[in-house]
Amino acid sequence: MSTSHPTGLEILEFTFPGSRPAGAIAPVLVGVVGSGNLEVLLEAAAGSDCSVRIETSARGFGPIWEAVLRDFHERHPLAGVRVSINDMGATPAVVSLRLDQAAAEVAS
């Protein structure tokens, strides 16, 4: 799902069914919002899904975001988590890196 935000950001939301409960975790923050980078916040949420909300300055890339997130979720089928992403034009490789870093923090 995609919506416009008054500041010109595009907001994308995705939900994936999870199979690996994250349990009671402290919020994890990785990355830095800046040119060509992004910030990922991963935190516990009610339910068994992995929900993702993206605020991005790079409009029109919903299908690419979905592909990157599906790939991440295949590697890390987390359940009961909410992922919030603030993006300033990061490449798919950087997005994957930051998501993997957040998942590694949860696993440790």
From Swiss-Prot:
Keywords: Cytoplasm, Phosphoprotein, Plasmid. The modification O-(phosphoribosyl dephospho-coenzyme A)serine is found at residue 35. Pfam families: ACP (PF06857). It comes from the Bacteria. It is found in: Cytoplasm. Covalently binds the prosthetic group of malonate decarboxylase. The keyword Ribosomal protein does not apply. Belongs to the MdcC family. This is Malonate decarboxylase acyl carrier protein. The lineage of its organism: Bacteria, Pseudomonadati, Pseudomonadota, Betaproteobacteria, Burkholderiales. The gene is mdcC.
